[in-house]
Amino acid sequence: VLSAEDKANVKAVWSKLGGHGAEYGAEALGRMFESHPTTKTYPFHFDVSHGSAQVKGHGKKVADALATAASHLDDLPGALSALSDLHAHKLRVDPVNFKLLSHCLLVTLAAHHPAEFTPAAHASLDKFLASVSTVLTSKYR
């Protein structure tokens, strides 16, 4: 459960991203594919090479979904319900990949925004991404 401080930290960091969300999403996906080769089995139809159009496109989708989540912190399940259905029933993404991508997102954000990435912000973002991952995997059962 995100505390009021966590919510404030998430909103503060998200407001600093500016128009770079898609870029950071693609960078995080690239990090995940390089660091965890087993994640390359999904999406099997993607060109997972660095800078590919598919990685950039999916990076934008990731960033947009996280922006939606960051603006609906009090109702993540409602805000992400359709996305949860998509990942569980159609795409069938391995649930472990959400945790791996979350870590890669944290690394990417820390690299680009070191001043904003305080220990408190790091902890809050980690909780936020874990909450998003939990919602996205909730319909796998």
From Swiss-Prot:
Q: Which residues carry this modification: N6-succinyllysine?
A: K7, K11, K16, K40
Listed under GO cellular component are: blood microparticle; haptoglobin-hemoglobin complex; hemoglobin complex
Q: Which residues carry this modification: Phosphotyrosine?
A: Y24
Residues recorded as bearing Phosphoserine in the entry: S3, S35, S49, S102, S124, S131, S138
Which terms does the record give in the GO molecular function aspect? Answer: haptoglobin binding; heme binding; iron ion binding; organic acid binding; oxygen binding; oxygen carrier activity; peroxidase activity
State where O2 binds: H58
Q: Which residues form the Globin domain?
A: 1-141
Which InterPro entries does the record match to this protein? Globin, Globin-like_sf, Globin/Proto, Hemoglobin_a-typ, Hemoglobin_oxygen_transport, Hemoglobin_pi
Return the Pfam families for the record: Globin
Q: Give the superkingdom in one word.
A: Eukaryota
Q: Which residues bind heme b?
A: H87
Positions carrying Phosphothreonine: T108, T134, T137
GO BP terms: namely: hydrogen peroxide catabolic process
Q: Please give the residue positions where the record annotates the modification N6-acetyllysine.
A: K16
Keywords assigned by UniProt? Acetylation, Heme, Iron, Metal-binding, Oxygen transport, Phosphoprotein, Transport
Which tissues does the record link to its expression?
A: Red blood cells.
Homology family: Belongs to the globin family.
Sum up the protein's function in the record's words. Answer: Involved in oxygen transport from the lung to the various peripheral tissues.
Quaternary structure, from the entry: Heterotetramer of two alpha chains and two beta chains.
- This one is known as Hemoglobin subunit alpha
